[in-house]
């Protein structure tokens, strides 16, 4: 390699106050150094010409003058600028190894590529953690992608060679979260931040205790019923919900830890070299894609399993609550306890209505407690939610409307405006508790959909089981509510309600979903319709494009002289300086 030009006196004067320029920095191309060529003249590690000009500067500081030396250094600097374009980026000794080392294992490949730069780089330190020389670029790429088996570990962890495949980006490409540096400058990866989501869980327990305690107060204060059974029922419900929250949080923590481990395998990898011939580059890219796909497949399966555990046992929690809540309210509404509440209770029937209405915020707290804890940091707002959480939000809104509809029917009994017979009163109570228990169906649907997505390892979509559950929920809730509304309008001269339009709209939507499911089963072979199904297996990846004709990847745009092992890097350096 051509030695650096410079006056002996100026170099010796600079050696006392500044370290010698590293030899690896002279091999570094412009696009890897960062900044413009003109702006890096005085940095001390950019090129040979800057070391010469620094020597002149040292002479000026040492002797107070030094103008002839500085002018001579400037002239030599301009000469070196013109020569650095045609200067090879890697010594010629490094070019002898690649033809025989392409099919070799990952161990000797970095040694062959970095043999000439080992002695010079031992006395110099890199200026940045993200900078790399051309020898490191060639050696690390060859060790990471062409090394055969074990190349991923050699490139990712550094191995024994000079180049390493570790990424130096400050953020995580998988989740978008900023990477948090650990102690002593080590990187922690994209482990999820321990955001505390115990607020909604605590609110759920408080609402359970408040509603159960008020109903117990009504049953115990105004009657002679035995009070231990009601309090024991409330304690059983609270303990069941606490166990559910504990299992849900434990499953989510396990899924987050496995996802963080698989992110390290997915994110920190070495890219295939850009200067290899076309067949070798295609083989290296296929190996890299295969290794990445294996790690990503495992991570995707674990992530889907964690998503499947997100709504697990939620339907059991709401079912336990519905079973414990129903006897108390039925006992109050079906007997004379309601009249005693109006006479003896502090707030009368208004307090009882508010106690019954606590079911809606309780359902909201349950949905938020199991969905917000697994949400990514940037998923604020309904349009940025995952499909399962989007579906849960829509089902919650529909359940709120159904509960409001059924509660207005129950108020006819509380106010006594319409003299309803006993069988119609019990029918109204039955419809109300069917509506109250309807979230069990869509919570189970979300759990089954997540389990199906975890088994196939892909995103969830509407399947036949979920459409059947939606249609069943519509038949159990909307049909009885609409029938009762029509009966009250015809037989008891009640005015038309806007909830009748709501019932018709929901029934029409669920009927269309059922018809769409039947149509999808008939056209399951269509790729556009099979893309969004639950049970459709993942499609095969498209075949790789055919390799270009010629001896190298850029054989159609560069000459044969530049088509060697490092011709691609030289071409980019010339283009960036022009």
Curated annotation (Swiss-Prot):
Pfam entry (one): CECR6_TMEM121
Transmembrane segments: none
InterPro entries (UniProt xref): CECR6, CECR6/TMEM121
Tissue specificity annotation: Widely expressed, especially in adult heart, brain, prostate, testes, peripherical blood leukocytes and fetal brain.
Pro residues biased stretches: 538-549
Biased composition (Low complexity): 8-17, 44-53
Superkingdom of the organism of origin: Eukaryota
Phosphoserine carried by residues: 167, 552
Biased composition (Gly residues): 54-67
Leader sequence segment: none
Keyword terms: Phosphoprotein
Region named Disordered: 1-84, 106-129, 529-557
Further comment: Candidate gene for the Cat Eye Syndrome (CES), a developmental disorder associated with the duplication of a 2 Mb region of 22q11.2. Duplication usually takes in the form of a surpernumerary bisatellited isodicentric chromosome, resulting in four copies of the region (represents an inv dup(22)(q11)). CES is characterized clinically by the combination of coloboma of the iris and anal atresia with fistula, downslanting palpebral fissures, preauricular tags and/or pits, frequent occurrence of heart and renal malformations, and normal or near-normal mental development.
PANTHER family: TRANSMEMBRANE PROTEIN 121B
Family label: Belongs to the TMEM121 family.
Protein's name according to its UniProt entry: Transmembrane protein 121B
Provenance organism: Homo sapiens (Human)
